[in-house]
Amino acid sequence: MSEFTKEHFATNVYYDRTFDRDAAKILPGEYYYTGKDMLIVTVLGSCVSACIRDRVTGVGGMNHFMLPDSGADADSPVSASARYGTYAMEVLINDLLKAGAKRENLEAKVFGGGAVLRGFIAMNVGERNAQFVRDFLKVEGIRIIAEDLNDIHPRKVYYFPRSGKVLVKKLKQLNNNTLVNREQDYANRLQSNNVAGDIELFS
C-alpha cells in the first residue's frame, strides 16, 4: 500500500494548558490511542472520526479519515473505497486490543461527515463517510453511544479516552481555508494513490 494511503500514528503531542494535560492532535489519515489520562483533538469537515474506548480499562483512541471516491461501485462493501474505510477502522481497533482493550467492552462515539468540501456535493462524501462508520460499527458489534454527524459545519472534537467524555464545538465561521485545503489535499492523495492496492485487514 502506498505511503499516502496508510493510516499514520499521530506524532503531534503537546501540553494543553486549557485542560491541564497532555494532548495529541490528529490530522486526516492519522489516528492515536492511549491508556493515559490524555486528550485527543481533531478538526473535522467532511471527514469522520470514531472515538473508541474500552469502557472498563479506559484504553481508547480516535481516527480521522474519509472514504476515497471509487466511482460507480463506491457503495459496494468490496469496493476500494469501503476497503480503505475498513482498514482505517481496523488499524485503530487492533491497536486498542494490543494495548489491552477487550472487544466486548468497546464503545464508540462518532463525529463529522459534514457537507464542507466544495465540489464534493455530487458524491455526498460527508454522508457516505457518516453512513460507512455507522454501518461498520454495527457489523462489528461495537455500540455507538453518541454521534454528531452530517450538517454543514466543521467541528472541533476534544476526546478524553480515559473517561469517554467528548466536547464538540461547531465552527460556524472559519478564519482561513486550512481545514478545507487539508481535507482536499487528503482526498486528492487518496484519489491519486490507488487504494485498491495491497490493504491488509487484521483478524
Swiss-Prot record:
Q: Give the main EC class.
A: hydrolase
Q: What role is this protein assigned?
A: Probably deamidates glutamine residues to glutamate on methyl-accepting chemotaxis receptors (MCPs), playing an important role in chemotaxis.
The Gene Ontology biological process terms listed for this entry are: chemotaxis
Q: Which InterPro entries did the record assign?
A: CheD-like_sf, Chemorcpt_Glu_NH3ase_CheD, Cytotoxic_necrot_fac-like_cat
The terms under GO molecular function for this entry are: protein-glutamine glutaminase activity
Q: Does the keyword Hydrolase apply?
A: yes
Gene source species = Herminiimonas arsenicoxydans
What protein family is recorded? Belongs to the CheD family.
Supply the Pfam families for this chain.
CheD
Q: What is its EC number?
A: 3.5.1.44
Give the protein name, as stated in the record. Answer: Probable chemoreceptor glutamine deamidase CheD
Q: Which reaction does it catalyse?
A: L-glutaminyl-[protein] + H2O = L-glutamyl-[protein] + NH4(+)
Show the HAMAP family listed in the entry.
Answer: CheD
- List keywords of the entry alphabetically: Chemotaxis, Hydrolase
